[in-house]
């Protein structure tokens, strides 16, 4: 009985000691803070410019002055000191080739898509490839990481919390709804695309043969109405070309 109580007291004392140690030595890494597990933007800056690392859908990696939906990242811890960085919108892993160029990939390769994270004395974070030893950088110059060195400015990052409304990450892509090409009423319900009917003379309604020259009528001697000055009796039933009224034909 006494031994059981003693074991309980020892367990309680150990738990209290562990809590006090954690409070005395908090982990200052932004990866393990309150923002861990949420959306993070990696921010880097110089005296002239500032950028947020973003991974596009085509795998291109660059920087944006402000937070964008493509600069929202998920940083997940793998082993001790190693992280995996993923673009939220592009759904691509941040990877590095043997020349130190960073890119986004849909396929995870432990050798190319894992980075070692270290916090510098100035509070900035650096990420370098354990395979190629190059630093993750938005600058053109690619440099390897050496302990105690001063890394280039565009390879030093600060983790910033996401300030973009979450609804921008859930907006569906517009899709074109296709209908049957035979259903004209659904395709153009307001008849906007249909051409309007035009009034054009139908040549067949006015194709009358000219009177024969053997006929003694005035129309026979002057079929075109040149001598008569084009004056014909319009009440005669429209026997001449001037009296022909073409019918409307819709085309």
UniProtKB/Swiss-Prot annotation:
GO biological process, one term: negative regulation of hormone secretion
Recorded GO MF terms: growth factor activity; type 1 fibroblast growth factor receptor binding
Keyword Nuclease appears in the UniProt entry: no
Biased composition (Polar residues): 205-219
PTMs per UniProt: Following secretion this protein is inactivated by cleavage into a N-terminal fragment and a C-terminal fragment. The processing is effected by proprotein convertases.
InterPro entries registered for this protein in UniProt: Fibroblast_GF_fam, IL1/FGF
Matches recorded under CDD domains: beta-trefoil_FGF23
Name of the protein described by the UniProt record: Fibroblast growth factor 23
Species per Swiss-Prot/TrEMBL record: Homo sapiens
Record gene name: FGF23
